[in-house]
């Protein structure tokens, strides 16, 4: 049996209203604290209710509007090095990843690019500031992962991570009320990203009985939440649990070919990562339905027996139908082009990650052409 390591937060608060724990956490151990957030949260009602108590506890605020670049992280480090001893992140996956990267690199001497996977030349240490992660979306699971994703679409054309076990946030606060009011597209894009994490981790060659059980639990939460994301408090609670479990399982078991492709497209095009994954998921399910790989067939049979035993169609085609029929936003219908040159670059750089099959370039091309319009 494959051995896995699961690393989680020291503290994880969960439930409606749990953001009320933030002020007591900060006042219990006063330290110079920097907030990373996004305009949608800072302009919202929850922040308004916290601002009078929170603002005096902060040195300042950095606003994140997209996936952070190495240059932006270096600028934050230069501005705050030696002044900050704790970080709070309130926002979506891009905000949390930016804060995780800053918390680590403010404790390292070299520029961000030197430590990044794929292109860096220096091993990153585990030095990092304590981080309180509070997601306002449910997709990346960044509040419990060991990596921070950094995207440079301008200079190095790379999307890669900083990674160390110590980069799991010290504390996570999972408050489903923070998802309320999110646009349907954001809810759907993030939720399908959470599903993709869970599904790829379930099918990973490095998964084991424990990680697969967590994946199945997360997928069950996703199936419950998906049709009702914009109309049910219970659905928001379920998708937040799915996202968290997706973060745990991807960290323990790894991801597959969908993310092996999505990361390379993300380095070339500023498309929402969750939408990219969702669009690649559908042709991947078609490919998977035709697979004769014994372990894939056994795992899909178990998934179907556990989660939708009354269905008699192939589990892959059931999932395609369920996802597309019940989506609150049609993530697969927008016109998202990539050029022929970008297709060639993506095929050259992408890989199957921890998939049970090493997918060939023609198979990966089939997925990409099924997900995007080639210009």
Each predicted region: which residue ranges?
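C-terminal catalytic subdomain
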Residues: 253-311
């Amino acid at each position: 049996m494959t051995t896995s390591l699961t690393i989680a937060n020291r503290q994880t608060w969960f439930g409606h209203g749990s953001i009320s724990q933030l002020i007591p956490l900060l006042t219990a151990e006063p330290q110079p604290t920097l907030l990373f957030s996004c305009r949608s949260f800072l302009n919202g009602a929850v922040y308004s209710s916290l601002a009078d108590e929170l603002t005096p506890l902060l040195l300042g605020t950095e606003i994140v509007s997209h996936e952070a670049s190495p240059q932006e992280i270096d600028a934050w480090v230069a501005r705050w090095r030696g002044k900050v001893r704790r970080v709070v992140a309130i926002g979506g996956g891009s905000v949390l990843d930016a804060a995780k990267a800053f918390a680590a690199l403010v404790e390292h001497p070299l520029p961000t690019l030197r430590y990044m996977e794929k292109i860096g030349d220096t091993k990153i240490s585990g030095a990092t500031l304590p981080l309180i992660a509070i997601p306002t979306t449910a997709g990346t699971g960044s509040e419990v992962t060991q990596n921070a994703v950094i995207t440079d679409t301008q200079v190095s054309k790379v999307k890669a991570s900083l990674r160390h076990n110590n980069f799991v946030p010290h504390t996570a606060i999972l408050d489903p009320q923070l998802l309320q009011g999110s646009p349907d597209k954001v809810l759907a894009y993030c939720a399908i990203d959470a599903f993709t994490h869970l599904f790829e981790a379930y099918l990973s060659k490095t998964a084991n009985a424990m990680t697969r059980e967590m994946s199945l639990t997360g997928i069950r939460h996703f199936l419950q939440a998906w049709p009702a994301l914009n109309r049910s408090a219970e659905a928001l609670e379920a998708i937040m649990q799915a996202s968290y479990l997706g973060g745990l399982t991807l960290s323990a078991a790894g991801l597959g070919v969908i993310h092996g492709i999505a990361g390379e497209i993300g380095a070339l095009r500023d498309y929402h990562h969750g939408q990219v994954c969702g669009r690649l998921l559908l042709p991947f399910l078609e490919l998977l339905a035709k697979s004769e790989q014994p372990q894939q067939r056994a795992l899909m049979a178990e998934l179907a027996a556990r989660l939708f035993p009354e269905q008699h169609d192939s589990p892959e085609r059931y999932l395609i139908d369920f996802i597309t029929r019940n989506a609150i936003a049609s993530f697969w219908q927008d016109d998202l082009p990539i050029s022929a040159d970008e297709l060639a670059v993506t095929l050259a750089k992408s890989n199957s990650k921890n998939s049970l099959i090493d997918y060939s370039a023609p198979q990966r091309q089939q997925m990409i052409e099924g997900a995007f319009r080639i210009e």
